[in-house]
C-alpha cells in the first residue's frame, strides 16, 4: 500500500487517469440512472425527464467559468477534486434515500450538487494528471488521458446496469416472499385492490393481482436504484480521499524533469 502511495506522489498521471475514469462513471452513469428511475418508477415521458433533469445542465453552465477562475487564482486543484468528488458523494447519498414518490423537488438538491461537483472536477483533473508530465510525454499522455473518461463511462454504465439488474432480482425475490397467500398484510392489500376494481366484474380479482404485482416490481426497482446510488456514494468518497495523496501540479501546466 505504501509503495502505491509513493508511486502516486511520484507520478500524477496514473492517479489523474483514475480520477478521470471515475469522473466518467459519475458523468455518464448518473445521466443514465436518473432517467431510469423517472421512466420506470414515475412513468415520465422523454420530455418530462428532460424538464426534470435540466437543473444539472444549468448548474454546469454557470459553474464552468467559476471553476476556471478558481484555477486561475491558484486554488489547489487537489482541493477542488476532493470537494468535487465529496459533493458527488453527498448528492448520490441523498439520492439513495429515494422513494417511489420522489419528483422534481426531491431530486433538485442531488442534481444541483451533481452539476456543481462535475465542473469542480473536470478542469482540475486534467491539470492534476498532466501537470507533472514531462513535455516529451505530453502528446501520448494527453491522448491516453482523454480515453479514460470515455472508458470510465462505458465501464460504469455496464457495471451500473448489471448491478441494477442483480439487485432488482434480489429485491423481487425478497418481496415475493412477503406477498404470498397466508400473509395478512398481503391478503388485506389484495382485498382492497379487488374492491377498488369492482367495475371489472368477474375479472376484478385478476386485475387486482396484476396491479399488486406491478406495485411490487415498482418497489423492487426503487430499492435496486437506491442500492446503486449507495454504491456510487462509496466510490466517490474513496476517490475523494485519494486527492490529497497526489503531488500538486505545476501551475504553469504540463511539464517536469
State where each predicted segment sits.
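Transmembrane core module of solute transporters
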Residues: 1-140, 252-257
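Hydrophobic transmembrane architecture of multi-pass small-molecule transporters
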Residues: 145-248, 254-257
